[in-house]
Amino acid sequence: MIVIFLGPPGAGKGTQGKKIAKKIDLPHIAIGDIFRTIIKTSTSEAELINNYVRQGELIPNEIVNQVIKNFLLSSEYKNGYILDGYPRNLEQAKFFESFIKEKIKIIYFDVSGELLIKRILGRYSCKNCGKIYNRYFLQPKTDNVCDVCGSSTFDYRKDDNEEVIKKRIEVYKTETYPLIDYYKNSGNFYIVNGSKNEQEIEIDIQKILKIN
């Protein structure tokens, strides 16, 4: 099974991707995480990618496509995966279809711009286990202590400020809305209301994928 999660930054793709992937025992491939890992390396490619991220711009298709192809053709993904954040435009979608022939399901997370900004500005994660929190909606049960692993060290993303977020959302709309129209005609396109809470969204996705 190959599942693509589409939606703007802050729509909840990462949170749901991890949950659903664990439930159906498939890898969750988060494109943003892949590129953030690359950025931490001391390479010219990392510096180039980081410049796009800091400015809230999308990384060029030729860079994204090659990185993703190298990942997806690995043997560990031969049985399927949940793909979070790719493709983002028609050119990427057609490139993806050129080397992936399996049937896919596309799930789009529909969320208002105002809620997206709050979700992104408020989010942070445990540095130890990666558990995601939000200062507006989902704080740890005990202040400054991770619910999962008990760590008190958290990571706040440096590219998450309101001006950059608004630009990322606008860039997303320009690049990705034509892709949504393209997939609507595929017969395997589904929309979930991303404004619901985590549990409700998870249930909706499980129904689409026909899992318990």
From Swiss-Prot:
Q: What is the recorded name of this protein?
A: Adenylate kinase
| Swiss-Prot/TrEMBL domain comment | Consists of three domains, a large central CORE domain and two small peripheral domains, NMPbind and LID, which undergo movements during catalysis. The LID domain closes over the site of phosphoryl transfer upon ATP binding. Assembling and dissambling the active center during each catalytic cycle provides an effective means to prevent ATP hydrolysis. Some bacteria have evolved a zinc-coordinating structure that stabilizes the LID domain.
The gene from which this protein is expressed is adk
Keywords assigned by UniProt, alphabetized: ATP-binding, Cytoplasm, Kinase, Metal-binding, Nucleotide biosynthesis, Nucleotide-binding, Transferase, Zinc
Binding annotation for AMP: 36, 57-59, 85-88, 92, 157, 168
What is stated as this protein's family in its record?
Belongs to the adenylate kinase family.
The source's superkingdom equals Bacteria
Q: Where is this region: LID?
A: 122-160
Quote any Pfam family the record assigns: ADK
- EC assignment: 2.7.4.3
The organism's taxonomy opens as:
Bacteria, Pseudomonadati, Pseudomonadota, Alphaproteobacteria, Rickettsiales
Q: Which PROSITE patterns match?
A: ADENYLATE_KINASE
**Residues annotated as region NMP?**
30-59
Q: Give the PANTHER family listed for this entry.
A: NUCLEOTIDE KINASE (PTHR23359)
Its subcellular locations are: Cytoplasm
Which pathway or pathways does this protein act in?
Answer: Purine metabolism; AMP biosynthesis via salvage pathway; AMP from ADP: step 1/1
Q: Which reaction does it catalyse?
A: AMP + ATP = 2 ADP
